[in-house]
């Protein structure tokens, strides 16, 4: 049986037009546009806007999951696009790369950092993940669980037993991978910023969501707190986007994915945080 370590990225050079599936629209609050959007992937496996400027002075790579990816937000209006536009408007010649990939865990992002990102020699990395970590930390197998998203190894799915659920959340491995990620950046002289994942709250949509997914809400909030504590304890710069966005439901189409208004708002907040 052939196995290989999973590199969590879009296939380089991909060009795709896609619309949100009906199932996703049904689960959203109505602010997810049903229109088709273009997804263009660079030769480095990043989601990007083909109309962005070619010239830049510094390279910032934002690594994360589907929240960073913003695949159903139009080109030029994604979270990272707005951050780059805002930095350029303030006189900073920056390229802000979208290294988001749906389902990425901190283990997978650490592998991508070491195998792919380091030789690019970026000036800065922004790490923003946690949604899938929140699913992994409830199992004894944790970040090595055999699920489609979590498994760091690509292998056949035959014969994998259901993961054993823990009586309480275990952040041990996640905290160590955050430390490994941060230490790797320090060793290779790359500035690291870590951001929390903005979450939604305080509206009828969330009342319905929590009625079905309350435990996930608790897990994701706990992961954000784990991120805050790690940054505080290890001297890593934190941009607390969860607190800055302030759970405002206008900026999400579900619990944590940005609609176009949210991508714009959070992108401006990210740029402001990078300049602080």
List the model feature ranges, each with a label.
Residues 129-228, 246-249:
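Serine-dependent acyl-ester chemistry module
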């Amino acid at each position: 049986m052939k196995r290989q370590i999973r590199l969590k990225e879009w296939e380089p050079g991909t060009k795709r037009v896609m619309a949100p599936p009906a199932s996703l629209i049904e689960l959203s609050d109505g602010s997810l546009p049903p229109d088709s959007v273009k997804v263009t992937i660079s030769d480095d496996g990043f989601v990007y806007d083909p109309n962005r400027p070619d010239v830049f002075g510094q390279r910032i790579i934002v690594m994360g999951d589907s929240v960073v990816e913003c695949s159903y937000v139009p080109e030029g209006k994604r979270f990272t696009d707005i951050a780059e536009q805002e930095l350029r408007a303030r006189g900073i010649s920056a390229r802000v790369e979208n290294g988001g990939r749906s389902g990425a865990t901190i283990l997978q992002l650490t592998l991508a950092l070491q195998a792919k990102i380091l030789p690019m020699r970026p000036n800065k990395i922004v790490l923003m993940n946690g949604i899938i970590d929140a699913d992994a930390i409830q199992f004894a197998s944790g970040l090595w669980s055999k699920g489609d998203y979590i498994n760091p190894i690509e292998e056949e799915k035959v014969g994998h037993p259901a993961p054993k659920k823990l009586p309480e959340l275990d952040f041990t491995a996640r905290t160590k991978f955050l430390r490994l990620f941060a230490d790797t950046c320090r060793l290779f002289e790359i500035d690291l910023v870590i951001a929390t994942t903005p979450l939604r709250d305080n509206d009828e949509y969330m009342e319905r969501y929590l009625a079905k997914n309350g435990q996930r809400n608790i897990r994701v909030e706990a992961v954000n707190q784990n991120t805050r504590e790690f940054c505080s304890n290890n001297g890593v710069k934190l941009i607390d986007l969860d607190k800055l966005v302030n759970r405002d439901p206008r900026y999400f189409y579900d619990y944590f994915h940005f609609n176009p208004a949210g991508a714009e708002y959070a992108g401006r907040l990210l740029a402001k945080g990078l300049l602080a």
